[in-house]
Amino acid sequence: MDIDQYMTDLGRRARHASRAMARASTAAKNAALDAVARAIERDAQALKDANARDVARAREKGLDAAFIDRLTLSDKALNTMVEGLRQVASLADPIGEIGNLKFRPSGIQVGQMRVPLGVIGIIYESRPNVTIDAAALCLKSGNATILRGGSEALESNAALAKLIGEGLEAAGLPQDAVQVVATADRAAVGKLITMTEYVDVIVPRGGKSLIERLINEARVPMIKHLDGICHVYVDDRADLAKALTVCDNAKTHRYGTCNTMETLLVASGIAAKLLPPLGKLYRDKQVELRVDAAARAVLADAGVGPLVDVTEEDWHTEYLAPVLAIKVVDGLDAAIEHINHYGSHHTDAIVTEDHDRAMRFLREVDSASVMVNASTRFADGFEFGLGAEIGISNDKLHARGPVGLEGLTSLKYVVLGHGEGRQ
């Protein structure tokens, strides 16, 4: 297979399909989503059979249990796909909305209309559910998409792509609006991220090595985040019960997510009250504690251990594991300085009962999501009321934070006149 020619053809077809998608009615898009949902229900066994072949090959390669779990399409996973499709269909269609409409002294009206981005390339690892999630959001937002999943999920993705194509055709929409790259060749990714004439934006969903490669090689703009080094700062005016709940949930709810707390900052004035019960809670949940000298003194005195001395590298590390770095700081200024220096601009939280300090934290912490008295785990499209998300961005341009339907659109100015000319 000539990868360059193959990818160029996918891009050309996607660009052509994107024009039809931009003018597609809400009813047609919802009909396509419903048709795909019904097709998954109908062909559930065939999908599981295709997935079983992918899983068998992954086991032969010796891939670990966590990877196999992400790859596997269980009945529950298929039901979640179906529910997700119907949920996206139920969301308000942002395309064509005109907002900020204002009358000008010249007599014209000026507003902004929400429109699709065009063609979106999605690059992800071996999670077949992303094929459906990404296709649904791109379809509802009026975009065409090229999906490049992990090589270990080729058969699963091909089977899902067939059903997506059926759904598009049943709704009178172009099948090329959702295309799945049918090769495991890594050169396909290299071509996709440089096809500026056909692809408007890339959304990568994967590990740090994938994102770093794309940052270095992509010519197409990206919506992405590299790390999720999330912090919780417990102020000396915090409610202790709230602090314990937030710190527990932010770290132990799920270890392997990008919105999990990796560094805990504790004001020196509350460290003696907070750290002993919190340290025991983490110890009972087998969380490794990497601590500075001040935190060690408090925790050791309370009989909490074992403790590991924190290093400079720890402040830069996204563990994605039951490991937590802890630092005692002088107060709010030091906490904000630490977060803005070491953080990844993803999600950070403060626990405090002081309104002025909370507002300062919200204003001054340079992150996509900033929270007061709430767990960092809430940084999620569903929890934010977006209905669904295609990913999280910690960049500052275009989309920032959880990216839902509106994040896959842009605004263009529209002018309504009555024959006016500029004086």
Swiss-Prot record:
Signal peptide: none annotated. InterPro entries: Ald_DH/histidinol_DH, Ald_DH_C, Ald_DH_N, Aldehyde_DH_dom, G-glutamylP_reductase_CS, Glu-5-SA_DH, GPR_dom. It catalyses: L-glutamate 5-semialdehyde + phosphate + NADP(+) = L-glutamyl 5-phosphate + NADPH + H(+). Transmembrane segments: none annotated. Keywords: Amino-acid biosynthesis, Cytoplasm, NADP, Oxidoreductase, Proline biosynthesis. It is an enzyme of class 1 (oxidoreductase). GO terms for biological process: L-proline biosynthetic process. Its EC number is 1.2.1.41. Pathway: Amino-acid biosynthesis; L-proline biosynthesis; L-glutamate 5-semialdehyde from L-glutamate: step 2/2. The keyword Plastid does not apply. Coiled coil: none annotated. Its main location: cytoplasm. One of its GO terms (cellular component) is cytoplasm. GO terms for molecular function: glutamate-5-semialdehyde dehydrogenase activity; NADP binding. The keyword Metal-binding does not apply. It is found in: Cytoplasm. NCBIfam families: PRK00197.1, proA. Catalyzes the NADPH-dependent reduction of L-glutamate 5-phosphate into L-glutamate 5-semialdehyde and phosphate. The product spontaneously undergoes cyclization to form 1-pyrroline-5-carboxylate. Belongs to the gamma-glutamyl phosphate reductase family. This is Gamma-glutamyl phosphate reductase. The gene is proA.
